[in-house]
Amino acid sequence: MLGIVIPAHNEEACLPGCLAALYVAASHPALRGETVLIHVVLDHCEDGSEDVLKRWQQRRQSACVALSWSQIDKRKVGAARASGANRLLARDVRWLAFTDADTQVSPEWLVQQLALEVDVVCGSVAVDDWSPHAGQAAMLRTHFSQTYNDRDGHRHIHGANLGVAADAYRKAGGFQSVPCHEDVYLVAALERIGARFAWSAAPRVVTSARTDARARGGFGDTILAVVAAATAAL
């Protein structure tokens, strides 16, 4: 079995698109019907995120894809990812794939992670809509295209596009219960145990450039820092 973990904090608006993409990826013919467990960890959600999941579970039936969710009250993305991973490991999954609620994976996402035949896959991200930043959108699009290395051999670490073999995850100790950089800390732990890595641009995801980032210090805040620096330079 394969497992996918998605942390969510007030993601009512983004979850439908995220789940739709995950169901397609989890149903890819190349997986040959292997069961894929999708687990969403609702962390201090005060919106209709759980209602979205309930409706989705009722309407989308699949022989090889199962959706579940749990709730925590930590406001820490590291705690959410760790909680979801532990639940899936208890179901004996062999591979853990991680993404975010504001991210949509490609149809080949899981297949391409597994095809690399390593312990850890660190993928890159793409942004296709910079409009939340209004007047700064063109500048951000240009800055991202010029500075972001979206090729094999990159050294980006994104919780929105990460895959880890279950055995390696256990050996490394899993995610730390931290509010941000949990992905960076996990990758460092995986490097220390000698895990085999692929720094690949093959497994594709598209993430948002929203201005109301959920994890302080994460990708969204990095974008806001670029905007702030550009504004200060004017």
Question: Which residues does each PLM region occupy?
Answer:
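Acidic helix N-cap motif at the loop->helix transition within catalytic regions
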Residues: 13-16, 47-56, 108
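Glycine-rich, basic loop-to-helix element that forms the pyrophosphate-binding segment
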Residues: 71-90
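Short, well-formed alpha-helical segments that are part of the catalytic scaffolds
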Residues: 11-28
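Short, flexible, basic/aromatic active-site loop/helix in glycosyltransferases
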Residues: 123-124, 136-155, 227
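Conserved donor NDP-sugar-binding/catalytic core segment of glycosyltransferases
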Residues: 108-135
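Short beta-strand-to-loop acidic/aromatic patch adjacent to the donor-nucleotide binding site
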Residues: 91-104
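A conserved acidic beta->alpha catalytic loop
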Residues: 41-51, 103
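Acidic donor-binding loop at a coil-to-helix junction in glycosyltransferase catalytic cores
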Residues: 180-186
